[in-house]
């Protein structure tokens, strides 16, 4: 089982059962100070966070990862250069690169390609899984055909996909991404935070559900989705 809480923009808090059978809480791209965020940075005082995954170092994705890691003792997981930066800032980190499974004993995790930009290392997506659920967070990316390999190799149950356009895929491209990845559930992200990335998630839902068996779950910031 996984409980996915949307924190606005591309930020998520996810609770799942780890490979060791214990409950794990992870954050992905925790820009907690985003304009749509339902939580405050102070809400993470005395919280148990196991891992913080950062897809790239743009401010709306690296976000508040360092502050939260210092407060909670969470390990930051990301491309080598981001993990090195985290260590320089005094927090624990796990460095990896795009390729195979990361050496994390209690979770399945893989850094995937993303078509974007980043100042520290390559931009990535991430596939993260526990005992019974696998989730793909695409990070910031354009559409690319190798998304079909992410679906083939890792079979994510849930795909978290940007739909806002301008900096990432728009609705049309994100629909094609769903067709390539073939997740059971797709959750849109990275839209309506700023004017340039204004998009209609209902249009995304209509197009996906009329062309694929995938179900689209639209989350407002602060809402949660439990799978299965």
Curated annotation (Swiss-Prot):
The keyword Chloroplast does not apply. The keyword Hydrolase applies. One of its GO terms (molecular function) is hydrolase activity. InterPro entries: Metallo-B-lactamas (IPR001279), RibonucZ/Hydroxyglut_hydro (IPR036866), UPF0173 (IPR022877), UPF0173_UPF0282_UlaG_hydrolase (IPR050114). It comes from the Archaea. PANTHER family: UPF0173 METAL-DEPENDENT HYDROLASE MJ1163, UPF0173 METAL-DEPENDENT HYDROLASE MJ1163-RELATED. Belongs to the UPF0173 family. This is UPF0173 metal-dependent hydrolase Smar_0891. It comes from Staphylothermus marinus (strain ATCC 43588 / DSM 3639 / JCM 9404 / F1). The lineage of its organism: Archaea, Thermoproteota, Thermoprotei, Desulfurococcales, Desulfurococcaceae.
